Protein backbone atom coordinates (compact mmCIF):
# COMPACT_ATOMS: atom_id res chain seq x y z
CA UNK A 1 0.00 0.00 0.00
CA UNK A 2 1.37 3.46 -0.96
CA UNK A 3 2.26 5.68 2.02
CA UNK A 4 -0.21 8.46 2.79
CA UNK A 5 1.53 11.68 1.69
CA UNK A 6 -0.30 13.65 4.40
CA UNK A 7 1.34 11.44 7.03
CA UNK A 8 4.77 10.88 5.45
CA UNK A 9 5.78 14.20 3.83
CA UNK A 10 8.10 16.08 6.26
CA UNK A 11 6.15 19.35 6.03
CA UNK A 12 2.63 18.00 5.51
CA UNK A 13 2.89 15.64 8.48
CA UNK A 14 3.54 18.63 10.79
CA UNK A 15 0.39 20.33 9.46
CA UNK A 16 -1.45 17.01 9.74
CA UNK A 17 -0.43 16.54 13.38
CA UNK A 18 -1.53 20.03 14.38
CA UNK A 19 -4.66 20.61 12.25
CA UNK A 20 -6.04 17.30 10.96
CA UNK A 21 -5.23 14.22 13.05
CA UNK A 22 -4.75 16.19 16.27
CA UNK A 23 -6.49 14.31 19.13
CA UNK A 24 -8.91 16.82 20.71
CA UNK A 25 -11.14 16.50 23.80
CA UNK A 26 -14.68 15.78 22.59
CA UNK A 27 -16.31 18.13 25.11
CA UNK A 28 -14.55 21.46 24.47
CA UNK A 29 -17.15 24.23 24.18
CA UNK A 30 -17.39 27.36 22.04
CA UNK A 31 -15.06 29.08 24.55
CA UNK A 32 -12.27 27.07 22.89
CA UNK A 33 -12.99 28.77 19.54
CA UNK A 34 -11.21 32.01 20.38
CA UNK A 35 -7.72 30.66 19.68
CA UNK A 36 -8.54 30.03 16.02
CA UNK A 37 -10.47 33.33 15.89
CA UNK A 38 -7.32 35.13 17.06
CA UNK A 39 -5.46 33.39 14.21
CA UNK A 40 -7.99 34.75 11.72
CA UNK A 41 -7.73 38.22 13.30
CA UNK A 42 -3.94 38.13 12.92
CA UNK A 43 -4.20 37.02 9.29
CA UNK A 44 -6.79 39.71 8.48
CA UNK A 45 -4.73 42.42 10.20
CA UNK A 46 -1.52 41.42 8.38
CA UNK A 47 -3.28 41.36 4.99
CA UNK A 48 -5.15 44.66 5.40
CA UNK A 49 -2.09 46.22 7.06
CA UNK A 50 0.18 45.22 4.18
CA UNK A 51 -2.24 46.78 1.68
CA UNK A 52 -2.44 49.97 3.78
CA UNK A 53 1.36 50.17 4.12
CA UNK A 54 1.61 50.28 0.32
CA UNK A 55 -0.19 53.65 0.35
CA UNK A 56 1.04 55.09 3.65
CA UNK A 57 3.83 57.65 4.09
CA UNK A 58 5.57 57.74 7.48
CA UNK A 59 6.27 61.47 7.55
CA UNK A 60 4.65 64.07 9.83
CA UNK A 61 3.79 66.35 6.91
CA UNK A 62 2.25 63.56 4.81
CA UNK A 63 0.95 60.84 7.17
CA UNK A 64 -2.52 62.33 7.77
CA UNK A 65 -3.00 63.20 4.07
CA UNK A 66 -1.77 59.76 2.96
CA UNK A 67 -4.44 58.07 5.11
CA UNK A 68 -7.10 60.42 3.71
CA UNK A 69 -5.79 59.69 0.20
CA UNK A 70 -6.06 55.92 0.84
CA UNK A 71 -9.70 56.33 1.87
CA UNK A 72 -10.63 58.65 -1.02
CA UNK A 73 -8.60 57.55 -4.04
CA UNK A 74 -7.44 53.96 -3.57
CA UNK A 75 -9.78 51.22 -4.84
CA UNK A 76 -11.65 50.03 -1.74
CA UNK A 77 -9.07 51.87 0.40
CA UNK A 78 -11.85 53.03 2.76
CA UNK A 79 -12.91 49.40 3.29
CA UNK A 80 -9.36 48.15 3.89
CA UNK A 81 -8.76 50.93 6.43
CA UNK A 82 -12.08 50.36 8.21
CA UNK A 83 -11.47 46.60 8.40
CA UNK A 84 -7.97 47.21 9.78
CA UNK A 85 -9.08 49.77 12.40
CA UNK A 86 -12.07 47.73 13.59
CA UNK A 87 -10.19 44.44 13.19
CA UNK A 88 -7.96 45.65 16.04
CA UNK A 89 -11.04 45.95 18.28
CA UNK A 90 -12.15 42.42 17.41
CA UNK A 91 -8.60 41.17 18.03
CA UNK A 92 -8.81 42.55 21.58
CA UNK A 93 -12.36 41.28 22.15
CA UNK A 94 -11.17 37.79 21.17
CA UNK A 95 -7.97 37.90 23.23
CA UNK A 96 -9.79 39.15 26.36
CA UNK A 97 -12.42 36.40 26.02
CA UNK A 98 -9.60 33.88 25.38
CA UNK A 99 -7.82 34.99 28.58
CA UNK A 100 -11.11 34.94 30.51
CA UNK A 101 -11.71 31.38 29.32
CA UNK A 102 -8.18 30.39 30.40
CA UNK A 103 -8.75 31.94 33.80
CA UNK A 104 -12.16 30.34 34.37
CA UNK A 105 -11.11 26.85 33.30
CA UNK A 106 -7.65 26.86 34.91
CA UNK A 107 -5.80 26.66 31.57
CA UNK A 108 -2.99 28.71 33.20
CA UNK A 109 -1.77 25.49 34.81
CA UNK A 110 -0.11 24.76 31.46
CA UNK A 111 2.54 27.28 32.52
CA UNK A 112 4.57 27.48 29.28
CA UNK A 113 1.47 27.92 27.11
CA UNK A 114 0.09 30.53 29.52
CA UNK A 115 3.35 32.52 29.78
CA UNK A 116 3.84 32.66 26.00
CA UNK A 117 0.20 33.78 25.82
CA UNK A 118 0.84 36.67 28.22
CA UNK A 119 3.92 37.68 26.17
CA UNK A 120 1.67 37.57 23.08
CA UNK A 121 -0.81 39.89 24.83
CA UNK A 122 1.96 42.38 25.70
CA UNK A 123 3.26 42.31 22.11
CA UNK A 124 -0.27 42.84 20.77
CA UNK A 125 -0.75 45.82 23.10
CA UNK A 126 2.54 47.34 21.90
CA UNK A 127 1.54 46.77 18.26
CA UNK A 128 -1.87 48.40 18.75
CA UNK A 129 -0.31 51.37 20.55
CA UNK A 130 2.29 52.15 17.86
CA UNK A 131 -0.34 51.56 15.16
CA UNK A 132 -2.72 54.09 16.71
CA UNK A 133 -0.05 56.79 16.31
CA UNK A 134 0.35 56.31 12.53
CA UNK A 135 -2.68 58.30 11.20
CA UNK A 136 -1.10 61.33 12.97
CA UNK A 137 -4.38 62.82 14.17
CA UNK A 138 -4.71 64.78 17.42
CA UNK A 139 -5.41 61.73 19.60
CA UNK A 140 -2.61 59.79 17.86
CA UNK A 141 -0.10 62.51 18.69
CA UNK A 142 -1.22 63.24 22.24
CA UNK A 143 -1.73 59.56 23.06
CA UNK A 144 1.85 58.89 21.95
CA UNK A 145 3.10 61.88 23.98
CA UNK A 146 1.30 60.85 27.19
CA UNK A 147 2.14 57.13 27.08
CA UNK A 148 5.80 57.46 26.03
CA UNK A 149 6.20 60.13 28.72
CA UNK A 150 5.36 57.50 31.36
CA UNK A 151 8.83 56.03 30.88
CA UNK A 152 10.29 59.24 32.31
CA UNK A 153 8.96 58.07 35.70
CA UNK A 154 11.69 55.40 35.76
CA UNK A 155 14.30 56.69 38.24
CA UNK A 156 17.69 57.87 36.97
CA UNK A 157 17.43 56.68 33.32
CA UNK A 158 13.81 57.75 32.66
CA UNK A 159 14.33 61.02 30.81
CA UNK A 160 17.21 59.65 28.70
CA UNK A 161 15.09 56.62 27.83
CA UNK A 162 12.15 58.77 26.66
CA UNK A 163 14.34 61.03 24.50
CA UNK A 164 15.96 57.92 23.03
CA UNK A 165 12.52 56.46 22.22
CA UNK A 166 11.34 59.77 20.71
CA UNK A 167 14.53 60.31 18.70
CA UNK A 168 14.46 63.95 19.83
CA UNK A 169 13.02 66.20 22.53
CA UNK A 170 9.37 65.61 21.65
CA UNK A 171 7.15 63.28 19.62
CA UNK A 172 8.10 64.23 16.05
CA UNK A 173 9.12 62.84 12.66
CA UNK A 174 11.74 60.34 13.97
CA UNK A 175 9.11 58.97 16.40
CA UNK A 176 6.56 58.44 13.63
CA UNK A 177 9.13 56.74 11.37
CA UNK A 178 10.26 54.26 14.04
CA UNK A 179 6.67 53.60 15.14
CA UNK A 180 5.80 52.65 11.56
CA UNK A 181 8.83 50.33 11.40
CA UNK A 182 7.77 48.72 14.70
CA UNK A 183 4.14 48.44 13.64
CA UNK A 184 5.25 46.61 10.51
CA UNK A 185 7.63 44.30 12.38
CA UNK A 186 5.66 43.31 15.51
CA UNK A 187 2.82 41.35 13.81
CA UNK A 188 5.43 38.98 12.35
CA UNK A 189 6.90 38.61 15.82
CA UNK A 190 3.37 37.81 17.04
CA UNK A 191 3.12 35.14 14.31
CA UNK A 192 6.38 33.56 15.52
CA UNK A 193 5.25 33.65 19.16
CA UNK A 194 1.92 32.10 18.13
CA UNK A 195 3.82 29.13 16.68
CA UNK A 196 5.67 28.71 19.99
CA UNK A 197 2.35 29.09 21.89
CA UNK A 198 0.80 26.28 19.79
CA UNK A 199 3.90 24.07 20.10
CA UNK A 200 3.62 24.25 23.90
CA UNK A 201 -0.14 23.63 23.73
CA UNK A 202 0.30 20.51 21.57
CA UNK A 203 2.85 19.16 24.06
CA UNK A 204 0.11 18.76 26.68
CA UNK A 205 -3.04 18.76 24.55
CA UNK A 206 -6.08 20.96 25.18
CA UNK A 207 -7.70 21.45 28.56
CA UNK A 208 -11.49 20.93 28.70
CA UNK A 209 -14.50 22.34 30.61
CA UNK A 210 -14.30 19.61 33.28
CA UNK A 211 -10.56 20.10 33.87
CA UNK A 212 -9.94 16.34 33.94
CA UNK A 213 -7.75 14.12 31.75
CA UNK A 214 -9.55 13.50 28.48
CA UNK A 215 -7.17 10.96 26.89
CA UNK A 216 -9.85 8.27 27.06
CA UNK A 217 -12.27 10.34 24.96
CA UNK A 218 -10.56 12.23 22.15
CA UNK A 219 -11.68 12.81 18.56
CA UNK A 220 -9.74 13.98 15.47
CA UNK A 221 -9.60 17.75 14.96
CA UNK A 222 -10.77 17.39 11.35
CA UNK A 223 -13.65 17.37 10.42
CA UNK A 224 -15.28 18.08 13.81
CA UNK A 225 -13.41 21.14 15.00
CA UNK A 226 -12.44 22.48 11.56
CA UNK A 227 -16.16 22.81 10.87
CA UNK A 228 -16.78 24.31 14.31
CA UNK A 229 -13.95 26.82 13.69
CA UNK A 230 -15.42 27.82 10.32
CA UNK A 231 -18.73 28.54 12.06
CA UNK A 232 -16.76 30.69 14.53
CA UNK A 233 -15.05 32.56 11.67
CA UNK A 234 -18.45 33.34 10.12
CA UNK A 235 -19.87 34.53 13.44
CA UNK A 236 -16.91 36.86 13.95
CA UNK A 237 -16.39 38.16 10.41
CA UNK A 238 -20.10 39.02 10.10
CA UNK A 239 -20.14 41.62 12.94
CA UNK A 240 -16.68 42.86 11.82
CA UNK A 241 -17.87 43.59 8.27
CA UNK A 242 -21.14 45.01 9.63
CA UNK A 243 -19.20 47.43 11.85
CA UNK A 244 -16.71 48.33 9.10
CA UNK A 245 -19.49 48.99 6.56
CA UNK A 246 -22.23 50.61 8.65
CA UNK A 247 -20.52 52.37 11.54
CA UNK A 248 -16.74 52.38 10.96
CA UNK A 249 -16.03 55.29 13.34
CA UNK A 250 -18.17 54.06 16.24
CA UNK A 251 -15.17 52.99 18.34
CA UNK A 252 -12.77 55.72 17.17
CA UNK A 253 -12.15 59.17 18.65
CA UNK A 254 -13.52 62.24 16.80
CA UNK A 255 -10.30 64.11 17.74
CA UNK A 256 -8.42 61.92 15.25
CA UNK A 257 -10.17 63.67 12.33
CA UNK A 258 -8.04 66.72 13.19
CA UNK A 259 -4.38 66.62 12.08
CA UNK A 260 -1.83 66.49 14.93
CA UNK A 261 -1.04 69.87 16.45
CA UNK A 262 1.57 70.07 19.24
CA UNK A 263 0.20 73.51 20.25
CA UNK A 264 -3.37 72.41 21.03
CA UNK A 265 -4.08 69.76 23.66
CA UNK A 266 -7.42 67.88 23.31
CA UNK A 267 -9.74 68.34 26.36
CA UNK A 268 -9.78 64.59 27.15
CA UNK A 269 -6.80 62.48 26.18
CA UNK A 270 -7.82 58.82 26.25
CA UNK A 271 -6.71 55.64 24.49
CA UNK A 272 -8.85 53.26 22.43
CA UNK A 273 -11.52 51.35 24.43
CA UNK A 274 -9.40 48.20 24.81
CA UNK A 275 -6.78 50.05 26.91
CA UNK A 276 -9.24 51.99 29.09
CA UNK A 277 -9.18 49.52 32.02
CA UNK A 278 -5.38 49.87 32.32
CA UNK A 279 -5.61 53.65 31.78
CA UNK A 280 -8.14 53.90 34.64
CA UNK A 281 -5.74 52.00 36.93
CA UNK A 282 -2.88 54.31 35.85
CA UNK A 283 -4.94 57.44 36.63
CA UNK A 284 -6.24 56.17 39.97
CA UNK A 285 -2.85 56.62 41.65
CA UNK A 286 -1.92 60.29 42.26
CA UNK A 287 1.80 59.60 41.79
CA UNK A 288 3.56 59.20 38.44
CA UNK A 289 5.85 56.26 39.27
CA UNK A 290 3.13 54.56 41.36
CA UNK A 291 0.68 54.86 38.48
CA UNK A 292 3.18 53.42 36.00
CA UNK A 293 3.90 50.47 38.32
CA UNK A 294 0.17 49.81 38.80
CA UNK A 295 -0.35 50.01 35.02
CA UNK A 296 2.41 47.44 34.44
CA UNK A 297 1.14 45.25 37.30
CA UNK A 298 -2.42 45.24 35.91
CA UNK A 299 -1.25 43.11 32.96
CA UNK A 300 1.87 41.42 34.39
CA UNK A 301 -0.27 40.01 37.24
CA UNK A 302 -1.38 37.37 34.71
CA UNK A 303 2.08 35.76 35.06
CA UNK A 304 1.19 35.02 38.71
CA UNK A 305 -2.06 33.15 37.92
CA UNK A 306 -0.50 29.63 38.08
CA UNK A 307 1.06 30.37 41.50
CA UNK A 308 -2.16 31.77 42.98
CA UNK A 309 -4.13 28.60 42.16
CA UNK A 310 -4.81 26.91 45.50
CA UNK A 311 -7.90 24.84 44.60
CA UNK A 312 -7.78 21.06 44.21
CA UNK A 313 -10.10 21.26 41.22
CA UNK A 314 -8.67 22.78 38.08
CA UNK A 315 -11.70 24.57 36.60
CA UNK A 316 -14.39 26.72 38.22
CA UNK A 317 -17.13 24.49 36.76
CA UNK A 318 -17.92 23.01 40.19
CA UNK A 319 -16.72 25.93 42.36
CA UNK A 320 -19.68 28.33 42.77
CA UNK A 321 -17.93 30.81 45.10
CA UNK A 322 -14.99 31.18 42.71
CA UNK A 323 -17.49 31.59 39.86
CA UNK A 324 -19.17 34.47 41.71
CA UNK A 325 -15.76 36.06 42.33
CA UNK A 326 -14.82 35.61 38.65
CA UNK A 327 -17.95 37.43 37.45
CA UNK A 328 -17.38 40.20 40.02
CA UNK A 329 -13.89 40.58 38.50
CA UNK A 330 -15.40 40.81 34.99
CA UNK A 331 -17.89 43.47 36.16
CA UNK A 332 -15.05 45.32 37.89
CA UNK A 333 -13.07 45.40 34.62
CA UNK A 334 -16.13 46.80 32.80
CA UNK A 335 -16.42 49.51 35.48
CA UNK A 336 -12.70 50.35 35.04
CA UNK A 337 -13.22 50.55 31.26
CA UNK A 338 -16.11 52.97 31.74
CA UNK A 339 -14.22 55.10 34.30
CA UNK A 340 -11.22 55.31 31.96
CA UNK A 341 -13.41 56.97 29.33
CA UNK A 342 -14.66 59.64 31.76
CA UNK A 343 -12.96 62.95 32.68
CA UNK A 344 -10.86 63.13 35.88
CA UNK A 345 -13.44 64.68 38.24
CA UNK A 346 -15.32 63.92 41.46
CA UNK A 347 -17.35 60.73 41.24
CA UNK A 348 -15.05 59.08 38.67
CA UNK A 349 -11.81 59.53 40.64
CA UNK A 350 -13.04 57.62 43.71
CA UNK A 351 -14.88 54.99 41.62
CA UNK A 352 -11.65 54.37 39.67
CA UNK A 353 -9.61 54.06 42.87
CA UNK A 354 -12.06 51.62 44.46
CA UNK A 355 -12.28 49.55 41.25
CA UNK A 356 -8.46 49.43 41.02
CA UNK A 357 -8.13 48.24 44.63
CA UNK A 358 -10.88 45.64 44.03
CA UNK A 359 -9.10 44.38 40.87
CA UNK A 360 -5.84 43.61 42.68
CA UNK A 361 -7.59 42.36 45.85
CA UNK A 362 -9.67 39.81 43.93
CA UNK A 363 -6.70 38.48 41.94
CA UNK A 364 -4.01 38.46 44.64
CA UNK A 365 -5.96 37.80 47.84
CA UNK A 366 -9.53 36.58 47.35
CA UNK A 367 -8.99 33.94 44.63
CA UNK A 368 -6.33 31.97 46.62
CA UNK A 369 -8.36 32.26 49.87
CA UNK A 370 -11.62 31.10 48.22
CA UNK A 371 -9.72 28.26 46.49
CA UNK A 372 -8.41 27.04 49.85
CA UNK A 373 -11.87 27.47 51.42
CA UNK A 374 -13.49 25.37 48.69
CA UNK A 375 -10.92 22.63 49.35
CA UNK A 376 -12.13 22.57 52.97
CA UNK A 377 -15.75 22.41 51.77
CA UNK A 378 -14.95 19.23 49.80
CA UNK A 379 -14.62 17.42 53.13
CA UNK A 380 -18.22 18.10 54.18
UniProtKB/Swiss-Prot annotation:
The chain crosses the membrane at residues 34-54, 78-99, 114-134, 179-199, 227-247, 289-309, 321-341, 348-368. GO terms for cellular component: mitochondrial inner membrane; respiratory chain complex III. It comes from the Eukaryota. Binds 2 heme b groups non-covalently. Heme b b562 binds at residues 84, 183. Heme b b566 binds at residues 98, 197. A ubiquinone binds at residue 202. GO terms for biological process: mitochondrial electron transport, ubiquinol to cytochrome c. The keyword Transmembrane helix applies. Its cofactor is heme b. Keywords: Electron transport, Heme, Iron, Membrane, Metal-binding, Mitochondrion, Mitochondrion inner membrane, Respiratory chain, Transmembrane, Transmembrane helix, Transport, Ubiquinone. PANTHER family: CYTOCHROME B. This is Cytochrome b. It comes from Pelecanoides urinatrix (Common diving petrel).
Amino acid sequence: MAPNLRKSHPLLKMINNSLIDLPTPSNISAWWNFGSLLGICLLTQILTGLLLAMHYTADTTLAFSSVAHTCRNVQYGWLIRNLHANGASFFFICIYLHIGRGFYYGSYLYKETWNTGVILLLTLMATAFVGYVLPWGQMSFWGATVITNLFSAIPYIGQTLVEWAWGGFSVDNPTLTRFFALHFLLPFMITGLTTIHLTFLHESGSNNPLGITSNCDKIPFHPYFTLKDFLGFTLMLLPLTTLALFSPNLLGDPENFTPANPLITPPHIKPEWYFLFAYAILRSIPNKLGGVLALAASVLILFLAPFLHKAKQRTMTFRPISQLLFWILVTNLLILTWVGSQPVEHPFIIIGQLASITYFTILLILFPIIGALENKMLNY
